[in-house]
């Protein structure tokens, strides 16, 4: 069932806001705060009985009593409203209170009938589903009042400014006083008891505006027209008309006071406290005018009322023959005047009965049979009841005609106001019909709130605890079933078999009820029978039941009506049964059964809201609370079971399709800019929406076809988010546009500042933070490890060079050569370290080593003096797959142990200042396969099969570093284990400060990391030629003339017919054509790799692009085909300057630049000193990281090969549009790239001196790896594994 909506938002189509209070200030219309607001009325009991700590009937009764005594008559059970009749005006239906419930969900306000109306109206608009409000309870519990308040609220909030819609609203409200006057009466239990049932359907257009209405009438208690018990009254209209009729009506229709008529005076109750018949009559006339009844129609209605009153005054006496005789002949004469018939016909119809005999289907003799006084009184009353009943039906039909919608309706809201359950001392056919309809309504409540709900949970496979309840279907079947025959069927059979004699028919019915004795809810007791209804046991009197069930007029009465000249009276009796028809006319029981089933069908097609009314006492006292009577009502209304189902169940459910359609805006995975983007099925989309909105998993369940939400608060939150979506989108657009206009210059400055400050080391910081995660707070830290400027630079010895695969500094190249690693092996980490070396018979000592980590192995290099020469050799190579664990102590020392599987040698014990960084790179290269052990005692293999331990202890006497002695390391206390790196020191702020406080832009670039742009490719345009190093200032070679340019120009000129223009004057010198640099291959370069250019010795090629990052590869062009070739295989062909075209003097050849000698150490580009612990080396340069991309065929989750220094690499792009080739970043990087390019050109020149004989194979230059990507840069490194 649909539940109402979001919190706080007003609805579209709102008429207007309520006017400000009297205390509103003149400034902006804001009401002044009132101290009284802090003293709110104390709440009695709980407003929602699902919150009761103990769910029993007695606890429910106690809670209702507390609230009733505190003038709080409304209480919730979930979305069901419980209303206790206060029998007084509490002042809670004013316009201000009505407006306070507008646009609010039921949890925001105290319980009220207006909240139910608001929920129904909102759900109709939001979900485009028909709604109905079912009001049930016993007579006098306040059902009619609740229905009036529902209509009052809907008319007030439903919007619509044109006159047609306002007319519909006025007519809907006018139906209440009009139908109350004709359909309600004062009873012992209720001063305004509905003696009929009505179902009002208000029809709305697509905008939620009322465009029409329709009323369905159910079973008017017409017997009340002629008979009432003591201290009850006839229908209100009789007292209103007799007391307040105009002089014209009194004169024309002979109207006197109510005491003058038998039908109004016999019960001896002419006046009622709290009822003003004069005022009510004026309201009735106003309602007639609003509905659109003409003056003639109103006169005819009052004429029929007067006729009924005068018919009641026809009194009988018994003549000598024992037949009925009218005591006052003037009365039937006046009745004849009012009905516009012959007076003799009236007398005959009221004292005689015409009987016809038939033989073989033919008409026989006609007899006039006189009636005795009892029979005559029955005929008189039958005429009065028929006129009033048909007139009431005509009024309802006339109302529907006036409210008939002029356009097509989209949805309806139905309000059911029907007579309550009745138990009297003498219960007859009317009570049977009324209680039957109430049983049907109770069955609907059970079907929708108890039975159907539990069946739906089972079908949808929802976790659920079954609740026991009483299903009254067995009682409904007892009354309405045909097979086995129920009470209505037994009545029909009795009427058919003994139709002439009512007493014989009643006896036949008593005999037939014996067949129902097997039903446990039925008990036959002579001339009476008992039915155990859901609301209690009722004893019914059989006498007169069959006659009331036939509900047929005598032929004499119908003939009298037919003879009338009043057209209105003719309209009241449109259909006359065909006497020749063999089909049995429908009985009253048939009609009420058909009406009840049609009502149930209509209600089942709508989404119901429930109002359960309770009568607090039988005396209509505003202060009396009859606990026993209310406890009985609580039980038969099933409030306890309703609370249990509500507490255990789900407040809202809907199909996946409708759920997605309603709430897809709330998830970025299912919508974009208001468009539905989900590609999966509706179930997965629904689940995604509920997950993305942050709803706790226990708050919802997914069924087979529907999604279930447990609490209404969750649904209200969803509705609130949905209502705010478009509002937030509009605000975001407005805010973004204002920010663009107001802060675009500041944004540019912030981007520049951020880029300058962070371009160098963002990735190094990320790697450093991952190192903290690796230690996981298990090891004390050194103070220098936590410095804000500390970065994990990786290749401190520059073994990997610019791309991590060679070409670094001289020392780095020497170390790489010493390891013997393959050309494509990328270096991730290199540093100086110390290895613990054991000595025979003495304690082990630390010995200096070089430590290199690649994507394949760990290399330990040692420098020794061999034959009086310093030699660096690879002491040990350990494959990464062989390392099982890395051991670290929990103190601040710098020792680590590499545990190697199945090694013949001892596990290396290393002392390295960058131990955390080394472990971090190890984990990245092995995808976290290496176990990191942190302990104060580390185990290692001293040799194969022999284990040893090295222990660590604190010693505050050790002032610096740590001390090793006899398998024990002593070290002082360090920083706490949970320490993290300190923030980098802030630079001194510039003179220009932003005008904002830093809230406009978020630090660190875009908020969504997924939106980070990919590096752009460098366009393949010919770069500016790099300067060549020489002994002095570097000179720039003049470009040679393009091959074939002259002939091409001649060819073009030859095709023209115009004469050649005259030559230029001799003094002018024409500019030379641009030359293309040509290079000659010094060696054979054989390759089959895609994108590479195979070269033979002495091949001449053109260089179209030189990689400025120093990777050693150039893009060359040979015979129109481009490809990559190593730059150290090429030599520049120096060409003489071409002869100027217009110069008369012979050309002057420019001498080729002097070939440089072999590059000496002084001529090499300066290499920054390697960082040493403690700052021993000065001028530490922080290089930029270049990470190797995943090779073809590699594992997709394999970590990047290395993060090493590269002074020539382009900056890493951290903001959109920066760091691209040719941009600001390229200008910054150009200076750093010049040295690498110059070194490559110098090497080519040196090789040119002896090109006649290629060097030995061993002397052939090593081919550098190709640039990664078209711009020579690799993709950014993946985030560290967490």
From Swiss-Prot:
SMART domains: MYSc, SH3. Residues 781-977 form the TH1 domain. One of its GO terms (cellular component) is medial cortex. Phosphorylation of the TEDS site (Ser-365) is required for the polarization of the actin cytoskeleton. Phosphorylation probably activates the myosin-I ATPase activity. Its main location: cytoplasm. CDD domains: MYSc_Myo1, SH3_Myosin-I_fungi. It is found in: Cytoplasm, Cytoskeleton, Actin patch. Residues 412-494 are annotated as: Actin-binding. Residues 727-747, 748-773 form the IQ domain. Residues 1029-1058, 1252-1269 have a biased composition (Low complexity). Keywords: Actin-binding, ATP-binding, Cytoplasm, Cytoskeleton, Hydrolase, Motor protein, Myosin, Nucleotide-binding, Phosphoprotein, Repeat, SH3 domain. Residues 44-723 form the Myosin motor domain. Residues 1074-1135 form the SH3 domain. Residues 1059-1068 have a biased composition (Pro residues). It holds the Pfam family Myosin_head. One of its GO terms (biological process) is actin cortical patch assembly. One of its GO terms (molecular function) is hydrolase activity. ATP binds at residues 137-144. The modification Phosphoserine is found at residue 365. Residues 1-30, 569-590, 973-1073, 1237-1282 are annotated as: Disordered. Type-I myosin implicated in the organization of the actin cytoskeleton. Required for proper actin cytoskeleton polarization. At the cell cortex, assembles in patch-like structures together with proteins from the actin-polymerizing machinery and promotes actin assembly. Functions as actin nucleation-promoting factor (NPF) for the Arp2/3 complex. The myosin motor domain displays actin-stimulated ATPase activity and generates a mechanochemical force. Belongs to the TRAFAC class myosin-kinesin ATPase superfamily. Myosin family. This is Myosin-1.
